[in-house]
Amino acid sequence: MSPSHRPVVITGNWKMYKTVKEACTFAKALLPVVEVSPIQVWIAVPFTAIYPVKQEIRNSRLVIGAQNMNDASEGAFTGEIAGKMVKEAGASFVLLGHSERRHLYKEDNAFINRKVKKALEIGLTPVLCVGETFEERKSGETQQIIRTQIQECLAGLTAEDLKTLIIAYEPVWAIGNGQNAKPEGAQEIHQFCRKIIKEIFSEELAEQIVIQYGGSVNPSNAISLLKQPDIDGLLIGGASLSLETFVEIVNDGGSIFNLKAKLL
């Protein structure tokens, strides 16, 4: 599949920001932009905001998701939330394996793999996050780390399973600190991710799967990242909290999508 045939997906990850009122106000203000954009716009909101935001934007093209879920359907897991709960609240997708979950809460690939399987089982689109730390990058381990994360997090899945899964490459060293991978460097890793998918599954699936980039994305680097042939979207943290900034990035995404389409 040509890169221009893959959808462009811009995802905002609000992390632990925005009250229900703030989230609803933001989402409603974003709708005029989303409705006319040629790309897909997703937001991973706090758990408390999933249902009210979904009600606020009912029947719109804006896609709402969760930032995490447990691999169990239910049980005595204080403070946890099940995938079926966030889906019932209105989530269409879920972020899994985000670096903050891996490093702050010690989630490993096996646990993330179980979450991915559960998400697929209940009809949530998993956005699988992978990426290396500064130390791993410095020691030349980037590709091995990425390979291991993808292989172990997707273990036991079929090609059919992956048709609704997104991969997000987020170099840990570039998250939330103003640093970001150079577009060419990010492209190299995205291309490598497709190579792994080809080895495990098929060339067809490798060309179809959407791979996002995340890591200090902002209006000054969004276009240069999205111009890369294997970067199909962006996973945005801090820059997604400002309506003005997020709209600018969404509009940039639409421009690049249209540009790539003309090259067919």
Swiss-Prot record:
Pathway: Carbohydrate biosynthesis; gluconeogenesis; Carbohydrate degradation; glycolysis; D-glyceraldehyde 3-phosphate from glycerone phosphate: step 1/1
Gene label: tpiA
Gene3D superfamilies, sorted: Aldolase class I
Major site of localization recorded for this protein: cytoplasm
Entry's Gene Ontology cellular component terms: cytosol
Name of the protein in question: Triosephosphate isomerase
The organism's place on the tree of life at top rank: Bacteria
Active site: H98 (electrophile), E170 (proton acceptor)
Organism encoding this protein: Protochlamydia amoebophila (strain UWE25)
Function: Involved in the gluconeogenesis. Catalyzes stereospecifically the conversion of dihydroxyacetone phosphate (DHAP) to D-glyceraldehyde-3-phosphate (G3P).
Assigned keywords, A-Z: Cytoplasm, Gluconeogenesis, Glycolysis, Isomerase
Any single GO BP term: glycerol catabolic process
